[in-house]
Swiss-Prot record:
Gene encoding the protein: glmU
Lineage: Bacteria, Pseudomonadati, Pseudomonadota, Gammaproteobacteria, Enterobacterales
One Gene Ontology term, aspect cellular component: membrane
Organism encoding this protein: Salmonella paratyphi A (strain AKU_12601)
Identification of the protein by name: Bifunctional protein GlmU
Active site annotation, chain numbering: H363 (proton acceptor)
Similarity comment: In the N-terminal section; belongs to the N-acetylglucosamine-1-phosphate uridyltransferase family.
Location within or outside the cell: Cytoplasm
Length: 456
């Protein structure tokens, strides 16, 4: 069916006392992203013309964290219930648009479920998302007559008979803007909590003869809210299990789906293999036949075809061309770039550095602010000394250079094509093509030397 224009209200004013945190509840993260951001993203994908965020506690921190100038920030200075929160947003509703109500602490709600709810909304009525629970204790119950929804009664206000009802309110609903404003104006706080319940509009709509269409989500977990860290951790595992399942069904080999975390967006080629305890953050692309070893963290990086990242390596804001090998225990920091066939071994760190085709840095090396050509060998213990205490400087190493172990390159410095740097050398001046450079303290031999004896 053809949908009306729609705006979304996200309720995010609660303090989250049971989180025992100074951070507003909705800013606690799920899959590396604030809970409320998941909800904002769903609203955006659904095509919301405007997203109204009702906030209260920690408003400044919310604004600083979300940094979204498209949001309409609506202050709820006193938290007097969900109906009161919607009343604060009501002046921004257009009469001819639909208003979808969501919650900042219900992060797993899917676009597909919301679209079905939107499609099911009757003309002049309400679309209401409900679920059936084996144990509905604590939730508002859906009351019906002859199968039709007539209202919602909160648990504290329910009779013993009503508490036997298993269908409960999720709090998510959609209604026309003009209708919603009229119903909101009629709300009272005559209940056990002394609050203004948005749920009371269901009875008001029924009294006007309006239809209330109940829709169920694809999964009950979509409507699970978060009140404490235990609930958040459970939703995290549900989310991660869903992401792992999608990857497995798309052809990615996860060696242990229960020990894989996706905290962003992952694009994979064919025959990708990911071992246990791998974390993917931000936007990551893995080419064909990429292998990621156990315990690796990959963040905002592009990994080319046939690359292999050995266990316990960290790759952040890096770009690897085809057939590169990394680790184990390697660290690629922002700006690291490896051309085809390059190798970075154990305990090697790169930052703002390019390693050319077929070049190798096998062990115990720091390469920072460096441009390294093709077919270069970087010996163990090599350091680019890029910082003088105030400024950073660049090291340039041309093609076919051999750098011996325990070399220090004091930037700014350039090493010419085909040069050889002997082990233990400190390079402080530019090196010409094909030169041999060495700087060593003369070796001293003392015959018959005796080690000191400890005094008694």
């Amino acid at each position: 069916m053809l949908n009306s224009a729609m705006s979304v209200v996200i309720l995010a004013a609660g303090k989250g006392t049971r989180m025992y945190s100074d951070i507003p509840k909705v800013l606690h993260t799920l899959a590396g992203k604030p809970m409320v951001q998941h909800v904002i993203d769903a609203a955006t994908k659904l095509g919301a013309a405007q997203v109204h965020l009702v906030y209260g506690h920690g408003g400044e921190l919310l604004k600083q964290t979300l940094k979204d100038d498209k949001l309409n920030w609506v202050l709820q200075a006193e938290q007097l219930g969900t109906g009161h929160a919607m009343q604060q947003a009501a002046p921004f509703f257009s009469d001819d648009e639909d208003i979808l109500m969501l919650y900042g602490d219900v992060p797993l709600i899917s676009v597909e479920t919301l679209q079905r709810l939107r499609d099911a909304k009757p003309q002049g009525g309400i679309g209401l998302l409900t679920v059936k629970l084996d144990d509905p204790s604590g939730y508002g119950r859906i009351t019906r007559e002859n199968g039709k929804v007539t209202g919602i009664v909160e648990h504290k206000d329910a009779t013993d008979e009503q508490r036997q009802i298993q269908e409960i309110n999720t709090g998510i609903l959609i209604a026309n803007g003009a209708d919603l404003k009229r119903w909101l104006s009629k709300l009272t706080n005559n209940n056990a909590q002394g609050e203004y319940y948005i749920t009371d509009i269901i009875a008001l709509a029924y009294q006007e003869g309006r239809e209330i269409a109940a829709v169920h989500p694809a999964r009950i977990s979509e409507t699970d809210g978060v009140n404490n860290r235990l609930q958040l951790s459970r939703l995290e595992r549900i989310y991660q299990a869903e992401q792992a399942e999608k990857l497995l069904l798309s052809g990615v080999m996860l060696r242990d789906p229960a020990r894989f975390d996706l905290r962003g967006t992952l694009h994979c080629g064919m025959d990708v293999e990911i071992d246990a305890n791998v974390i993917i953050e931000g936007y990551v692309t893995l080419g064909h036949r990429v292998k990621i070893g156990a315990g690796c963290i990959i963040k905002n990086s592009v990994i080319g075809d046939d690359c292999e990242i050995s266990p316990y390596s960290v790759v952040e804001d890096a770009h690897l061309e085809a057939a590169c090998t990394i680790g184990p225990f390697a660290r690629l920091r922002p700006g690291a770039e490896l051309l085809a066939g390059a190798h970075v071994g154990n305990f090697v760190e790169m930052k703002k550095a390019r390693l050319g085709k077929g070049s190798k840095a096998g062990h115990l090396t720091y390469l920072g602010d460096a441009e390294i050509g093709d077919n270069v060998n970087i010996g163990a213990g090599t350091i680019t000394c890029n910082y003088d205490g105030a400024n950073k400087f660049k090291t340039v190493i041309d093609d076919d250079v051999f750098v011996g172990s325990d070399t220090q390159l004091v930037a700014p410095v350039t090493v010419g094509k085909g040069a050889t740097i002997a082990a233990g050398t400190t390079v402080t001046r530019n090196v010409a093509d094909n030169e041999l450079v060495l700087s060593r303290v003369p070796q001293v031999h003392k015959q018959g030397w005796q080690r000191p004896v400890k005094k008694k």
